[in-house]
Amino acid sequence: MAQKTLLIITDGIGYRKDSDHNAFFHAKKPTYDLMFKTLPYSLIDTHGLSVGLPKGQMGNSEVGHMCIGAGRVLYQDLVKISLSLQNDELKNNPAFLNTIQKSPVVHLMGLMSDGGVHSHIEHFIALALECEKSHKKVCLHLITDGRDVAPKSALTYLKQMQNICNESIQIATISGRFYAMDRDKRFERIELAYHSLMGLNHTPLSPSEYIQSQYDKNITDEFIMPACFKNYCGMQDDESFIFINFRNDRAREIVSALGQKQFSGFKRQVFKKLHIATMTPYDNTFPYPVLFPKESVQNTLAEVVSQHNLTQSHIAETEKYAHVTFFINGGVETPFKNENRVLIQSPKVTTYDLKPEMSAKEVTLAVLEQMKLGTDLIIVNFANGDMVGHTGNFEASVKAVEAVDACLGEILSLAKKLDYAMLLTSDHGNCERMKDENQNPLTNHTAGSVYCFVLGDGVKSIKNGALNNIASSVLKLMGLKAPATMDEPLF
């Protein structure tokens, strides 16, 4: 088995048994009908733990393409950190240990919620308890959310933090994320949060009383004014500080204010030394230890093909170009040797339901051209099912599927003539469910399975699997050995 191969990603076209509001089911799709009758196919998981996301969370194009290209599950920061903490690995984490061992006082700061977008309260609690085991005094600097969770939910999360408080662990400050997590260089906001860290803006109220006093002024969690509580005298020289958010964009400014030598946002208290660490890499210019460094993704599908001196072409329209280049290549921006990239402009319309065919025809022409040139691997993304599905327009989504189906017909026909193998799947679903339980338009991705079809010499059946099984399957069609880092193929 060694064939030139097509990897076709039909973005946003998923599997769903029910036909109600299912644009894929209701579309006229002779090519799909032919594939169902003549090609082996299976179902592929695209969400939750199968792609490294939290259990039950819908997949997305970035994660999906990363998983496809890597050929293995790349756990996202939230899941990776949670698994590490569940396995009690923090006690052996060098960045964590080195940071807390430098001072009897450890300051922990981060977003106090279970929203899972920037942080998770379980991480906050786990770090505090591990510091306590090392006989440290722990100062908690709580950032209230109200954006990724309900606007007035802080008291619920506060109770969880108070449950671990004792003589060693105390709540030192509180601030709404509007102030402590600015990302737009509005340093007048950061300055207020910074002042509370320094022991300014004292309130005589308890943390719960203070939150309630803000609610009484119609101030919700996101906008709670920064304050510090009794018995907290501010950060001191030679103390340790860990910011527990795993997402970097809204953590940079406050960490810069605390630790960067070059800072012009506002006048700061001068420290000889603070021992700062961050949960994940926040900025390439930051010198601070990182508890959970970025995972290097090597031996991706594109890299392996390049190592064998074979040619490849990655094709998509604007909306999905980054996904078939940067993301599918494991976060590598520069093309590999013999890797050609074709960018087709997406139509300039306000919303894609106005032109559900998008640029699928132009994408198809580029694919056909590469096939005629004999390119060894062609990776192509059809954006229609996802981008039109996001509009919530059922009729337009049906047309989007029909447009993709027509394009697939041309590609499949030429593939058979030129002896190309083909693997067709989706990175996640969308257009197969266009209304929610209340009959309102549903515009988000679905948390379900997608189809996988294979055309290849000797391939009679394929197993159910997940996106991490795609790369090794493509390499097998090409007659190439998959690296040990990749998971097993589907056949």
UniProtKB/Swiss-Prot annotation:
In its UniProt record, a GO molecular function of this protein is:
manganese ion binding
Location of the active site: S61 (phosphoserine intermediate)
Positions contributing to Mn(2+) 1 binding: D386, H390, H445
Query: Enzyme group, top EC level?
Result: isomerase
Q: Which InterPro entries match?
A: Alkaline_phosphatase_core_sf, BPG-indep_PGM_N, Metalloenzyme, PGAM_B_sf, Pgm_bpd_ind
Q: Which residues bind Mn(2+) 2?
A: D11, S61, D427, H428
Q: Provide the Gene Ontology terms for cellular component.
A: cytosol
Identify the keywords attached in UniProt to this record, alphabetized. Answer: Glycolysis, Isomerase, Manganese, Metal-binding
The pathway is:
Carbohydrate degradation; glycolysis; pyruvate from D-glyceraldehyde 3-phosphate: step 3/5
- Which reaction(s) does its UniProt entry say it catalyses? (2R)-2-phosphoglycerate = (2R)-3-phosphoglycerate
Q: What cofactor is needed?
A: Mn(2+)
Pfam name, any one: iPGM_N
State how the cofactor is bound: Binds 2 manganese ions per subunit.
Q: What is its EC number?
A: 5.4.2.12
User: What's a BP term from Gene Ontology annotated to this protein?
Assistant: glycolytic process
Q: Where does substrate bind?
A: H118, R147, D148, R177, R183, R247, N248, D249, R250, K320
Functional note? Catalyzes the interconversion of 2-phosphoglycerate and 3-phosphoglycerate.
Query: How the protein assembles, per its UniProt entry?
Result: Monomer.
The family assignment reads: Belongs to the BPG-independent phosphoglycerate mutase family.
Entry protein name: 2,3-bisphosphoglycerate-independent phosphoglycerate mutase
What organism, scientifically named, is this protein from?
Helicobacter pylori (strain ATCC 700392 / 26695) (Campylobacter pylori)
Q: What is the lineage of its organism?
A: Bacteria, Pseudomonadati, Campylobacterota, Epsilonproteobacteria, Campylobacterales
Please name the gene that encodes this protein.
Answer: gpmI
